[in-house]
Amino acid sequence: MRVAILGMGAIGHLVARALDGRAALVFVDRTRAPVREGERHVDAALVTTKTPGTPWAADVAARLLDPEGVVLTIQNGLGNYETLAQRLGRERVALGVIYVGAALRPDGSLFSTGPGAIEAAPPAADGPARRFGELATLLRAGGMRVSVVADPWPSVWRKLVANAAMNPTTALFGCTNAELLAHPAGAPLADELARETARVASGAGVAIREDEAVAMWRRIGETLGANRSSMLQDVAAGRPTEIDAINGAVASEGERRGVPAPVNRAMTLLVAALSEPRGESATAESAAAG
């Protein structure tokens, strides 16, 4: 099986490690031309890029993917599936989530809290669904836990509860998941983000109890205690974050469903401000004010 990995960050490296020696891998990032002359198409494409890169990934997949091939997105947040489906057709796109803590060390080596667990639903079309099954088998052979579900949206919203609770708070307070659990301000804030996200999920048709949502993020926080969230890593590195696709998307979906989500909206603004470049003018203003 020929598999493209679109986005070579930590999750891309993790998936590549699982598939190494089991599939013919094509690594694609923004520095590589998506299709070289004479290059074969791929049977499957795994989208592991951050949300801002999804339109790019959709364009690359459209050029690389075999007509009977499948695209599997295991990205964070909302909106990625729709972007891919609009470009490639819903019948070829599989939606899933991954649970793992991972980061690339300065020397380029991979740190992860484990092999990773994926929950995903196959696409509707027969050919892409068969390729999805083959890909799931290869990932399992590489040590990943892969659960195939009929409806991906409960998995998406449950992962979103954890992301919405932990990612912005760890970024705001500069702490690991374990440190967040013990933080006198951060932990209650994450609890409220989880409760609010559960209310929005229920409004969107995925019933999640508020107490269940709180227990969910806390359980993941304990399991992946040493992990530094991807949003914390992005803020520390001065990279764009996925705040709009996570807390921003929760707030927007809440507005659409008539479910207020003011804490998610506030966190979206705070992390966006935290991520703004601080140039010489900002430094000069700070010095003048001091």
Tell where the protein language model's regions lie, with residue ranges:
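NAD(P)+-binding Rossmann beta1-loop-alpha1 motif at the extreme N-terminus of oxidoreductases
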Residues: 1-36
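Short internal beta-strands
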Residues: 26-30, 120, 251
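Internal alpha-helical scaffold of NAD(P)-dependent oxidoreductase catalytic cores
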Residues: 63-64, 83, 87-92, 109-210
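Rossmann-like NAD(P)(H) cofactor-binding subdomain of soluble oxidoreductases
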Residues: 17-18, 35-109
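Residues at the C-termini of beta-strands that transition into short coil/loop
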Residues: 29-31, 75, 97, 114, ...
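NAD(P)-dependent Rossmann-like dehydrogenase/reductase catalytic/cofactor-binding core
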Residues: 191-290
